[in-house]
Amino acid sequence: MRGRTLLLFSLAVVTFVAAGSPARAAGTDYKGWFVALDVASTQPTGLDNRYATAIDLTNPTTTPQEFLFFDNKAGFSGSVRVGYSFGELGGLEATYWSFDNDDSMKKTEGTNYIYPLVFGGYAFNNAGTYGLAPPATYTVTSSIKAHTGDLDYFRVQDAGEKFTIKWIGGLRAASFDEDLTFEGSDTGAYTAGIKQTRHIDSKAFGVKAGAKLSYGLTKHFGLQGTLAFSILQGTSDQHTIQIANGVVDELKLSTDHIQGEIRDYDLRAVWSWPRFDLYVGYGGQTWDGLPKVRTGSEIQLTTGLPTKAVSDDRSSIGFMSYHAGVVWRFGKS
């Protein structure tokens, strides 16, 4: 990450040093259609996927416990934006952003007892004997899908010789889907096999407002920064299933009329020409309150063992991106 950031900074410095006359950021008098395509390497954050507890029962006095976390890797995301500008009267634009990534891991445990937490802990299933004794082999899979769709009115305003401000206001729809699965077995008589799955589905709709500041450094190069804020209302649902030794447990949770927020931020370097722009940048989204479900519980493993709490309720997640894109304009200034 540090290398990519240094590269972007170096490009900006070199271009600034080679500057010609500063260009006004495009926008106030442009009339016509435009299309923007964006691709990104996106890292989801805040998922806090605790899939199991590892217990070392060789020392009954201290009984060390360790939460095991699934590490969600970065994946690709993309967005498309289509709009029409009426010049000084402003314009309309529609934007769709999507992130879809699957991860998996397989592990063999030769020392610790493994108690999976995907179902929610023993306060949910009342079965403290559901676990894997060493040696045990298990697989964890994760699927994350997030989408936003925006319909915005915008208006571009001159703020100086080099500055323009693009004011944005409109509507936003957002959705988040997550699947987490634990499946394992051991070779002893303790447990034949365990499979736990959890599905989270959250949808919301609301309003959005923001601004994009453009600063022209040279005739064909400038910087852009964007901040936007959305307030949304929606629902979150959770469905978990456990199959252990032929016994099936199922749990459904639903949260209605939740209020959440999405904050967008972005900083990019832009190379501009009359018909198109090229850019690279760093940005992301922070989702607060969306989704909002209970994915953990207080855990009591067996009589006499210490109790620990799990509270990974997805109350704040994020998507951080290094991205690049192109904008085409089909009208005239």
Regions found by a protein language model. Give the residues of each.
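Outer-membrane beta-barrel "beta-signal"
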Residues: 34, 273, 316-333
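Transmembrane beta-barrel architecture of outer-membrane proteins
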Residues: 32, 75-79, 146-150, 164-166, ...
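Transmembrane beta-strands of outer-membrane beta-barrel proteins
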Residues: 33-37, 90-94, 165-171, 207-209, ...
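Short glycine/proline- and aromatic-enriched beta-strand/turn motifs that initiate or cap beta-hairpins
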Residues: 24-99
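Transmembrane beta-barrel domains of outer membrane proteins
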Residues: 81-85, 154-156, 212-214, 268-272, ...
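Transmembrane beta-strands of outer-membrane beta-barrel pores
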Residues: 39-45, 96-102, 171-177, 229-235, ...
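Extracellular/periplasm-exposed beta-strand and loop segments of Gram-negative cell-envelope proteins
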Residues: 47-73, 100-146, 175-204, 233-262, ...
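Outer-membrane beta-barrel channels and translocator barrels
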Residues: 30, 87-89, 158-162, 216-220, ...
